[in-house]
């Protein structure tokens, strides 16, 4: 992941003094996807409002307004939706309790959040195609986790649409997970009311 420091001032405030939100998402891929989409429409990226969701080992969803990435999930450090091996946002109280339970070292907690979290934590597999196929074969837990990941990703996309005051030209999906037609179709069903969805 690469940073881009164009966040709105209000996007940086967390509600916990001393902890500031930073811009840390899949910037290069998100910008490249946004530019490619704009060019395909004969438009300039700097004249568009886009929500770009990178779906891969990590998930990050970002709001792009007039050529600037003004807000986005920090998927590496626990923002937004969970992904194949990252937890995404968690209930803070339960997380604090886990940190002070004596069960885990600091390093173990970091590993549980990034590497052993997300889909991996539930089905011991971080390969979307493998988990999807297990679901098709009747493993209900695999289907449940895929659907929950779609649900949380859709919530993040909706949140970024509000950052753009609902004025969204398109929702763009990118990253390795978009090769799964089921996930793309489910996301389109959930967020298609916001704007046209493109892969």
Residue ranges: model-predicted function:
Residues 24-28, 32, 59, 89-93, ...:
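Conserved active-site and cofactor/substrate-binding residues in soluble primary-metabolism enzymes
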Residues 111, 115-165:
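Adenine-nucleotide phosphate-binding core of ATP-dependent small-molecule kinases
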Residues 1:
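Conserved phosphate-binding loops in N-terminal lobes of ATP-dependent enzymes
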Residues 47-53, 108-115, 169-173:
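Beta-strand segments within the central parallel beta-sheet cores of soluble alpha/beta enzyme folds
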Residues 30-38, 92-100, 107-114, 129-132, ...:
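Predominant activation on well-ordered alpha-helical scaffold segments within soluble catalytic domains
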Residues 4-101:
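Glycine-rich phosphate-binding loop of actin/hexokinase-like ATP-binding domains
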Residues 168-190:
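Glycine-rich phosphate-binding loops at beta-strand->alpha-helix junctions
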Residues 195-199:
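Short, intrinsically disordered, charge-balanced linker/junction segments flanking boundaries
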């Amino acid at each position: 992941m690469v940073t881009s420091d164009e966040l709105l001032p209000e996007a940086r405030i967390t509600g916990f003094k001393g902890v500031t939100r930073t811009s840390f998402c899949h910037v290069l891929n998100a910008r490249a996807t946004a530019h490619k989409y704009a060019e395909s429409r004969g438009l300039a990226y700097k004249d568009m409002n886009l929500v770009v969701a990178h779906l891969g080992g990590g998930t990050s969803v970002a709001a792009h307004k007039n050529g600037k990435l003004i807000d986005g999930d920090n998927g590496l450090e626990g923002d937004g939706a969970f992904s194949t091996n990252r937890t995404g946002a968690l209930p803070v109280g339960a997380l604090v309790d886990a940190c002070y339970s004596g069960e885990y070292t600091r390093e173990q907690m970091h590993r549980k959040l990034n590497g052993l979290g997300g889909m991996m934590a539930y089905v011991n597999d971080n390969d979307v195609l493998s988990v999807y196929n297990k679901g098709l074969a009747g493993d209900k837990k695999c289907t449940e986790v895929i659907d929950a990941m779609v649900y949380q990703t859709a919530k993040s996309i909706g949140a970024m649409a509000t950052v753009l005051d609902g004025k969204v030209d398109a929702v763009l999906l990118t990253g390795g997970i978009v090769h799964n037609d089921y996930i793309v179709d489910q996301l389109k069903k959930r967020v298609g009311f916001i704007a046209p969805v493109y892969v």
